[in-house]
Amino acid sequence: MAIPYRTRRTIRRALTVCLVVAVLLVTVCLCGMIWVQRYIVYAADGSVRIDFDLPPLTMGNTARPPQRLDITINIEETNQNPDFTGELTQLGGFYIEPETLTDIPAVLEQLKELPAGTPIMVDVKSIRGDFYYSSSVSSRRSNTVNTEDMDNLIAYLKDSGLYVIARVPAFRDYAHGLENVSDGVYHSSGGYLHMDAQGCYWLNPAREGNISYLTKIITELRTLGFHEVMLTDFSFPESNNILVNGDRQEILTKAANILLTACGNDSFAVSFEMTENFTAPEGRSRIYRSGLTATEAEQAFQNSTLPNPAVNLVFLTELFDTRFDAFSVLRPLMGAY
């Protein structure tokens, strides 16, 4: 049935009136909510209440912008050519991971971010007897490290203002042991050289030829601009099946003193990566320890008989435990970024 026109018109007017009333009610509610917000109190316990007894807000003076303070900050410029002579100081720096030497240009980019005076350690020779740089001591070169790139790296380090440390395997050298059999460490059964689990021959620390060989390497590194050399594998092989004529620790202590006397001076240190049982030579030298936890490092520091463990005892670690920061410590360069 069709709705008459008059009825439809009446309904339309009624709906229009209802819509207008609804809009007015919504507007009044919104205005009321805005007005009542000034009386809303948020309690510390998270509850909310309305308090109409709050005093009305008063208009104050226009807030002034904060006064600008002219503060002079004195920034001491970093000395690009720091003096590394005199007493040794505590180290806090980095070592270049050997595997990253396959991309020396990338290593150089990282080094350029370091401030002058930062200690940096780099490997210059492998346990196979390969030299990473253009050495005059030996013609053996690495197949994995580009010699020209390594020469450029060493040249950069020399003029960088960084404190540069060369890491060198001392008595673990496959090629030199093979070429100088009489100076090697022999198996206890006699007649042949001892070979370790990694297939390397070891050099006898008691042999003058080996001390002379190391002296030449260290002296060359000193002339290339290094401030310190750190000798790893400064020991006999960890085996009871080798021939040793004499006390092992006495032989190593004597070798360390000879090398320090021959190569060390007031601007160049000869250091050793050793265990806690090694007696360090007196002079410009440090003892390096690696593979320790922070707790073990704290114990090693407390038990150290070195004259100044904060300076003469250095930890090599991949850990970023802040307890290491109280000591001399070197961490991976890759971890600096």
What are these model-predicted stretches?
Residues 1-14:
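N-terminal Lys/Arg-rich, disordered targeting/topogenic segments
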Residues 16-34:
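Hydrophobic membrane-insertion alpha-helices, especially the h-region
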Residues 32-47, 284-337:
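Substrate-binding cleft of secreted/luminal carbohydrate-active enzymes
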Residues 76-77, 128-169, 239-267:
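Aromatic-lined substrate-binding rim segments of carbohydrate-active enzymes
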Residues 84, 88-99, 171-219:
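Active-site-adjacent "subsite" loops/lids of carbohydrate-active enzymes
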Residues 95, 163-173, 230-233, 249-292, ...:
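Aromatic-lined carbohydrate-recognition surfaces of secreted/lumenal glycan-active proteins
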Residues 105-131, 220-230, 284-287:
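Catalytic domains of carbohydrate-active enzymes, especially glycoside hydrolases
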Residues 119, 145, 149-194:
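Glycine-rich, aromatic-flanked loop segments that form ligand/cofactor-binding clefts
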